Design a protein with these regions (language model features):
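S-adenosyl-L-methionine/SAH cofactor-binding core of RNA-modifying enzymes
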Residues: 1-43
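Alpha-helical scaffold segments in soluble metabolic enzymes
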Residues: 2, 76, 80, 135
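Short, well-ordered secondary-structure micro-motifs
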Residues: 24-26, 50-52, 108
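Short glycine/serine/threonine-biased micro-segments
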Residues: 40, 44, 61, 85, ...
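Structured adenosyl-cofactor binding patch, chiefly the S-adenosyl-L-methionine
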Residues: 47, 51-98
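Internal, active-site/partner-interface "lid" segment
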Residues: 72, 84-123
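SAM-dependent methyltransferases
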Residues: 114-173
């Protein structure tokens, strides 16, 4: 009761396998929350039901598996939300272009050297042609999503270019 009296504008979240499944949209919602967020983390047996009911806490799950406590799920939720707050990341474009920001997986990443044990960086990435690099990256991202997480394609807002790419990927499948 003291907490409710001192901080009436709290949003209380319990990391729980009984909650709604956490996703990028929930991270965006939490990143824009103006109230203070409080995460309650049970350990082994969870949290007394009266706490959930008394505080009107919402439950959020990070997946269908069991951990020893709610600390790790709370950290996952916090990290995913905080990185979306302007000014937190050094590069504002990072959060916008990461996987799931628009329901598409990322394209493959390459670093130096250009040849590692016979595995080469794709020529297009070494070409310096920014438009071709952009097209290659988009093609690879759509291809990754199609093969690894096709469920995300249903949520994606496909441009005309994306639709053409997806059709090409499907033909080659």
């Amino acid at each position: 009761d003291a907490i409710k009296n001192d901080y009436p504008e709290l949003r209380i979240i319990i990391a729980s396998p009984q909650g709604i499944t956490f996703n990028h949209n929930k991270a965006v919602e939490l990143s824009r929350e103006e109230r203070r967020l409080v995460f309650l983390c049970g350990h082994y047996e969870g949290i007394d039901e009266r706490v959930r009911l008394g505080f009107g806490a919402e439950e959020i799950s990070i997946g269908d598996y069991i951990l020893t406590g709610g600390e790790l799920p709370a950290m996952v939720i916090i990290d995913a939300a905080v990185r979306l707050i302007p000014g937190v990341l050094g590069d504002e474009d990072s959060a916008r272009h990461d996987s799931f920001a628009d329901f598409i997986l990322d394209y493959p990443q390459y670093t130096r050297p250009p040849d590692y044990k016979g595995m080469n960086v794709p020529e297009v990435l070494l070409s310096g042609n920014h438009e071709e690099i952009r097209k290659w990256r988009r093609m690879q991202a759509i291809k990754n999503t199609y093969y690894k997480r096709p469920d995300l394609l249903e949520k994606m807002k496909l441009t005309d270019e994306d639709k053409k790419i997806l059709n090409e990927v499907k033909k080659k499948a």
